[in-house]
């Protein structure tokens, strides 16, 4: 395989000649430090290479070494709880090797530790017919995750050998498959190219909600397992905290958090918090189900693209094991900016705001890899990849290309409103601009498993919030006193919805996570208040009198979100009794 020669260097873009027979997206090693790069365009025998490391000090005429392979990552036991850079190099191994807090250029570190021995338990026997995706054994990687060892997708045949139960490294052959006369060894670890989606048998309709513990996300704009969501918002509106809450509390089996081009101190916060946090679903440390990819803003821009693909490929791998995985990316705007930067250096024709014309197709490729699927292989199993990505529009302008193109491909839109953030309403998700295409799909799950009136209560809350916005303009002009009594009740119910339900403190031990049952109990209180109060207003009782009769009950309902724990829901029975008692007294008065 002939090596190339550098002819031009422009930041992260390197042009090399003598690259005859090179392949698109082939990985190359650039210059004497052997920096990792990827071929993104070929013209004759010239190759345009985006380099994933700092190119300072590289000179023309230095060699470019070809590898003949696409950008691939290692998949196997040892991923969970690890912190990787954008090229899947473990940061702790780099620090041990370099004795420095900085990532040295051209450093080669295995992604999965070669020395650790894992206890392998075989699940198949010699002579079995196997195909790609079959589970041939398990490794208990952490107390939360049973790592299922899969046959690589394109391997099939008769199992010629399988090792006995015991301890093995990721490079030890654990099985041999007779594939059309060839002996193919299978190890605990496999490699997969990041740009190629992993195969599955069938894509399924997402019908089960991914519970996040955040009330506005679970109830007003729910996301299903296998769904796609975007969180756009200007600086300071709470994107990172919302995504961190998703990563911490969501009901996914595996969470992959990709910090793509965001500030280093935000990733540092993550790395400090995660080891001490407990998973609310199991009580175990959160790191036992989490993988972190740290690719901060001071790292080379080209590596942002790699980090997004590395994250989604790892998510697909755990999906194929039959797990529900969540990929959190913060933020895709930084990836799009990297595409714009590289497109400009490659002298491509720019589209809107300088972004490349292929931006929509790249975003589509990324979001299409989400979904709930029936996996290949035996035994039959189902898995999902849910994608939630932040978008950082400059100045909060949702019409800019990245946000507007993202909206074409996602089914859930959680827009953050800076005016809500300034009013200290968190999460600052605008309930008028947001949407979810999964409400109808997940309503049956909520009605069956949580509360049969869930859909009715949710729709009442949404209608009230929309009506309150319509009335706000009138209130600004002539004040609330000029409104009809039923409209005054709308304002009061909307205030209760916002204060008792939509507002949530991500830093409060009790309020940070609301179970589905707790959410339904709060909704039920609001629904009862609105239903009974509407009847009384129709009978001529003023809204003010109803609110005054409540005394401290409404503030008590508002405080309950941070006062009543998820396992103390019987306390809501007392609040319900008090509420109904007040309305019974008012009805007696109205009847006399």
Swiss-Prot record:
Keyword tRNA-binding part of the UniProt annotation: no
InterPro entries named in the record: AAA+_ATPase, ATP-synt_VA_C, ATP-synth_a_Xtn, ATP_synth_asu-like_sf, ATP_synth_asu_arc, ATPase_F1/V1/A1_a/bsu_N, ATPase_F1/V1/A1_a/bsu_N_sf, ATPase_F1/V1/A1_a/bsu_nucl-bd
Keywords from the UniProt entry: ATP synthesis, ATP-binding, Cell membrane, Hydrogen ion transport, Ion transport, Membrane, Nucleotide-binding, Translocase, Transport
SMART domains: AAA (SM00382)
Membrane topology annotation: Peripheral membrane protein
Top-rank lineage group of the source organism: Archaea
One Gene Ontology biological process: proton motive force-driven plasma membrane ATP synthesis
CDD domains: ATP-synt_V_A-type_alpha_C, ATP-synt_V_A-type_alpha_N, V_A-ATPase_A
Molecular-function annotations in GO: ATP binding; ATP hydrolysis activity; proton-transporting ATP synthase activity, rotational mechanism; proton-transporting ATPase activity, rotational mechanism
Alphabetized SUPFAM superfamilies for the sequence: C-terminal domain of alpha and beta subunits of F1 ATP synthase, N-terminal domain of alpha and beta subunits of F1 ATP synthase, P-loop containing nucleoside triphosphate hydrolases
NCBIfam families to which the protein is assigned, alphabetical: ATP_syn_A_arch, PRK04192.1
Functional summary from the UniProt entry: Component of the A-type ATP synthase that produces ATP from ADP in the presence of a proton gradient across the membrane. The A chain is the catalytic subunit.
This protein's name: A-type ATP synthase subunit A
Gene that encodes the chain: atpA
């Amino acid at each position: 395989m002939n090596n190339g020669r550098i002819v031009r260097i422009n930041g992260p873009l390197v042009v090399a000649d003598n690259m005859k027979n090179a392949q698109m997206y082939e990985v190359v090693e650039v210059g004497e430090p052997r920096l990792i790069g990827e071929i993104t365009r070929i013209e004759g025998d010239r190759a345009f290479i985006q380099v994933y490391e700092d190119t300072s000090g590289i000179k023309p005429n230095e060699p470019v070494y070809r590898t003949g392979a696409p950008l691939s990552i290692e998949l196997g036991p040892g991923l969970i709880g690890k912190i990787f850079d954008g090229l899947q190099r473990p940061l702790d191994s780099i620090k041990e090797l370099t004795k420095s807090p900085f990532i040295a250029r051209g450093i080669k570190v295995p992604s999965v530790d070669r020395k650790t021995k894992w206890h392998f338990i075989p699940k198949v026997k010699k002579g079995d017919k196997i195909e790609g995706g079959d589970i041939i054994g398990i490794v208990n990687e952490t107390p939360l995750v049973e790592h299922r060892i899969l046959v690589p997708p394109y391997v099939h045949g008769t199992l010629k050998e399988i090792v006995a139960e015991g301890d093995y490294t990721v490079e030890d052959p654990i099985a041999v498959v007779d594939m059309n006369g060839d002996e193919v060894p299978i190890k605990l670890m496999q490699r997969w190219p990041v740009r190629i989606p992993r195969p599955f048998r069938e894509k399924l309709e997402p019908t089960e909600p991914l519970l996040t513990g955040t009330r506005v996300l679970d109830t007003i704009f729910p996301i299903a397992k296998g769904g796609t969501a975007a969180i756009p918002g200007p600086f300071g509106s709470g994107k990172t905290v919302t995504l961190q809450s998703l990563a911490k509390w969501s009901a996914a089996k595996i969470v992959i958090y990709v910090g793509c081009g965001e500030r280093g101190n935000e990733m540092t916060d993550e790395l400090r918090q995660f080891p001490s946090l407990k998973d609310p679903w199991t009580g175990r440390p959160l790191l036992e189900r989490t993988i972190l990819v740290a690719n901060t803003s001071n790292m080379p821009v080209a590596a942002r693209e790699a980090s997004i693909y590395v994250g989604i490929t790892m998510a697909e791998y755990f999906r194929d094991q039959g797990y529900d995985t969540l990929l959190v990316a913060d933020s895709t705007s930084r990836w799009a900016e990297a595409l714009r930067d590289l497109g400009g250096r490659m002298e491509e024709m720019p589209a809107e705001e300088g972004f490349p014309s292929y931006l929509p197709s790249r975003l589509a490729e990324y979001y299409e890899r989400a979904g709930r699927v029936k996996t290949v292989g035996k035994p039959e199993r189902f898995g999902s990849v849910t994608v939630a990505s932040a978008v950082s529009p400059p100045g909060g302008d949702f019409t800019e290309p990245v946000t507007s193109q993202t909206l074409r491909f996602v089914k859930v839109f959680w827009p953050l409103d800076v005016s809500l953030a300034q009013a200290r309403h968190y999460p600052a998700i605008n309930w008028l601009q947001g949407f979810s295409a999964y409400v109808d799909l997940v309503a049956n799950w909520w009605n069956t498993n949580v509360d049969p009136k869930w859909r009715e209560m949710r729709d009442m809350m949404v209608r009230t919030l929309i009506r309150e916005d319509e009335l706000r303009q009138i209130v600004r002009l002539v004040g609330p006193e000029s409104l009809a009594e039923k409209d005054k009740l709308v304002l009061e119910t909307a205030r209760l919805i916002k204060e008792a339900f939509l507002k949530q403190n991500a830093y409060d031990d009790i309020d940070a996570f609301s179970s589905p049952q707790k959410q339904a109990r709060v909704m039920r209180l609001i629904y009862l208040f609105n239903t009974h109060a509407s009847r009384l207003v129709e009978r001529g009782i003023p809204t003010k009198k109803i609110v005054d009769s409540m005394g401290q009950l409404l503030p008590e309902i508002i405080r309950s979100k941070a006062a009543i724990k998820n396992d103390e829901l019987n306390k809501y029975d007392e609040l319900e009794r008090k509420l109904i008692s007040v309305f019974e007294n008012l009805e007696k008065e109205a009847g006399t």
